[in-house]
């Protein structure tokens, strides 16, 4: 029986990584927020890999943190190993990765939600989103409770009509043995939302006591622990190791002999899987020139013997999985605790969304996370905080926060999803960001904290710490650019000791730092008046000085990019009325409805010639009295 259960400003459907960030952002911005989850035991659950961050994903976590989100703070409290990846490469691709204690991560995040002012966390299954005259009115639960609200954020993850697949066994269930949501999809279809079917998977977990680590290569954490959050401060903690091993010819033989039993290859799986995280059977069949593949054995927490077998995601039958795992060095006697599985689920076509993550045709209805066709905890959290901020701004009658490709990886992620769409689970990579030297993980706060503060999410504590960090960097850069190092004998002796060449004439310290064999830290011997600053300030100075020319080039590219982004296209424009556009371009433009010329130029099927036509049209449109160039 239906009954009115109360009213909220915002209702969040789902409490995974997107839902947690969305709910916290909305509540912290002063909105009365309800966060619904199928079970309170799955808040911030990690159904797959037990880590946060990694290449490009670490950038997203830093950006979530810079905006005022919780993911970075939460992993800093609960990690069991920390590692900076890609340190042999340039700073644009340096990425922080932390091994999580999965249960502690969940428990702390749940506690944060439970104690957050303005936030009500409840175990409820939402079965429909109710809309009237194109505007959200509320949500209805399976128990008949109707919650009136001004905005809804859908963060339902991989739970919509999800199906677990292990060989020829298939059943209706959510990830990790949890129940799924089978009714919400129909509500979305009734609202005119296009759905598609995606697939992802997870590897087996084995008992630590049954693993022979002597046959594996130890992968310890970094001695210097670098936190994800800009407000965490120094962290000193004992760390655990991960372990590396490899598949071999015997492993591949087991897979090849049983490939006919794989639902990936016999047609049982209809959903599209992630290109950049293929199953082990997919890797073996697609890359037959490779005689081995990496397997990482990762602990799932301090208080469990479960070990994650990274790199062996599979949907092969259980008996084949047992054979396959026992061929891997160190896993000959491994006891499987959880069987690997594939999961199919409903998700939306993200081109139905605006850059604010609000549906174009439903006022007040937002969507974030894997339901939008992305993969990964970090991608979900990044979308979640943007949706939460924009839903709150919507309720408050304010303009949305739109992050562009030059603002951060979050902007790249959202722009890719809403402009190009995706035919497979979308994974963030550094190669997707054109301006990655500007969008480094070390400067996320310089790019985004002011934005987070302006929308009312960044706390005064965080803002004050950011201001101090910003001032320290600016003052030190200014000092170094003015500090002159003379070519006197004493100075030259020290410079030669550092492996560099003597000075022929005086030089500014800032220019001296640019020498590849020198850096800010080693030159302290020539700088007795140097202030005592945190190490991260010195790291920033090294990057800014050494890559100054490249950074300036990218800044010029961004200036050009912004010119097109400022050429706004009319919201109600019917592209059939624009003369000389090709039919394909008209169809794509009418579907995507880009905000501006920049976004239009990134739509697949819209050519440079079409963009020229649009620019001519806009010039005529402007001359008739409607200015679209901000």
UniProtKB/Swiss-Prot annotation:
Q: What is its main location?
A: cytoplasm
What Pfam families does this protein map onto? GIDA, GIDA_C_1st, SAM_GIDA_C
A Gene Ontology molecular function term of the record? flavin adenine dinucleotide binding
Keyword NAD among UniProt keywords: yes
Cofactor requirements of the protein: FAD
Quick one: which residues bind NAD(+)? 273-287
Annotated keywords? Cytoplasm, FAD, Flavoprotein, NAD, tRNA processing
Location comes to: Cytoplasm
Q: Which SUPFAM superfamilies match?
A: FAD/NAD(P)-binding domain
GO CC annotation terms, alphabetical: cytosol
Q: Which Gene Ontology terms describe the biological processes this protein takes part in?
A: tRNA methylation; tRNA wobble uridine modification
Q: Where does FAD bind?
A: 14-19
Transit peptide as a keyword?
A: no
- Report quaternary structure and partners: Homodimer. Heterotetramer of two MnmE and two MnmG subunits.
Q: PANTHER family per the record?
A: GLUCOSE INHIBITED DIVISION PROTEIN A, PROTEIN MTO1 HOMOLOG, MITOCHONDRIAL
The job of this chain, per UniProt, is described as: NAD-binding protein involved in the addition of a carboxymethylaminomethyl (cmnm) group at the wobble position (U34) of certain tRNAs, forming tRNA-cmnm(5)s(2)U34.
Q: Which family does it belong to?
A: Belongs to the MnmG family.
The protein here is known as tRNA uridine 5-carboxymethylaminomethyl modification enzyme MnmG
């Amino acid at each position: 029986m239906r009954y009115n259960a109360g009213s909220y400003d915002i209702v969040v459907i789902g409490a995974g990584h997107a839902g947690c960030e969305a709910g916290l952002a909305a509540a912290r911005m002063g909105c009365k927020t309800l966060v619904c989850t199928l079970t309170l035991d799955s808040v911030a659950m990690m159904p797959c890999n037990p880590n946060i961050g990694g290449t490009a994903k670490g950038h997203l976590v830093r950006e979530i943190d810079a905006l005022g989100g919780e993911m970075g703070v939460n992993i800093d409290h609960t990690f069991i190993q920390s590692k900076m990846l890609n340190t042999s490469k340039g700073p644009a691709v340096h990425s922080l990765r932390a091994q999580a204690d999965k249960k502690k991560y969940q428990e702390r995040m749940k506690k944060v939600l439970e104690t957050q002012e303005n936030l009500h966390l409840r175990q409820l299954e939402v079965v429909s989103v109710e809309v009237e005259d194109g505007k959200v009115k509320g949500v209805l639960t399976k128990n008949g409770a109707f919650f009136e609200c001004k905005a809804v954020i859908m963060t339902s993850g991989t739970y919509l009509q999800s199906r677990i697949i292990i060989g020829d066994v298939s059943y209706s269930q959510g990830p990790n043995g949890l129940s799924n949501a089978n009714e919400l999809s129909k509500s979305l279809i009734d609202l005119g939302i296009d759905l598609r079917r995606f697939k992802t998977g997870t590897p087996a977990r084995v008992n630590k006591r049954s693993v022979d680590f002597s046959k594996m290569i130890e992968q310890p954490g970094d001695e210097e622990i670098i936190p994800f959050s800009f407000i965490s401060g120094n962290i000193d903690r004992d760390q655990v190791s991960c372990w590396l091993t490899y598949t071999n010819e015997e492993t591949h033989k087991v897979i090849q002999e049983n490939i006919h039993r794989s639902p990936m290859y016999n047609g049982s799986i209809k959903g599209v899987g992630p290109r950049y995280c293929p199953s082990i059977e997919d890797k073996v069949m697609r890359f037959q020139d490779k005689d081995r593949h990496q397997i990482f054995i990762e602990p799932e927490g301090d208080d469990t013997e479960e070990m994650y077998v990274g790199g062996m995601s599979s949907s092969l039958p259980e008996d084949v999985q047992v054979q396959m795992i026992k061929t891997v060095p160190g896993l000959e006697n491994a006891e499987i605790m959880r069987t690997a599985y594939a999961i199919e689920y409903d998700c939306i076509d993200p081109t139905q969304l605006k850059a604010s993550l609000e549906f174009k045709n439903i006022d007040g209805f937002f969507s974030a996370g894997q339901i939008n066709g992305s993969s990964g905890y970090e991608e979900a959290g990044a979308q979640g905080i943007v949706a939460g901020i924009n839903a709150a701004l919507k309720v408050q009658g304010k303009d949305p926060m739109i992050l562009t490709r030059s603002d951060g990886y979050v902007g790249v992620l959202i722009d890719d999803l809403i402009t190009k769409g995706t035919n497979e689970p979308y994974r963030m990579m550094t190669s997707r960001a054109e301006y990655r030297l500007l969008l480094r993980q070390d400067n996320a706060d310089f790019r985004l904290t002011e934005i987070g503060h302006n929308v009312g999410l960044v706390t005064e504590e965080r803002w004050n710490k950011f201001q101090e960090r910003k001032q320290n960097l600016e003052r030190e850069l200014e000092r170094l650019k003015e500090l002159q190092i003379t070519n006197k004998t004493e100075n030259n002796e020290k410079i030669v000791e550092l492996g560099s060449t003597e000075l022929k004439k005086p030089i500014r310290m800032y220019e001296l730092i640019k020498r590849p064999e020198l850096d800010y830290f080693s030159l302290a011997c020539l700088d007795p008046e140097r202030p005592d600053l945190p190490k991260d300030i010195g790291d920033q100075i090294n990057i800014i000085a050494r890559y100054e020319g490249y950074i300036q080039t990218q800044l010029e590219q961004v200036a050009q990019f912004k010119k097109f982004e400022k050429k706004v296209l009319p919201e109600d424009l019917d592209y059939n009325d624009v003369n000389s556009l090709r039919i394909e371009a008209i169809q794509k433009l009418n579907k995507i409805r880009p905000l501006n010329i920049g976004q239009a130029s990134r739509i697949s099927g819209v050519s440079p010639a079409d963009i020229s036509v649009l620019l001519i049209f806009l010039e005529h449109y402007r001359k008739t009295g409607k200015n679209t160039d901000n």
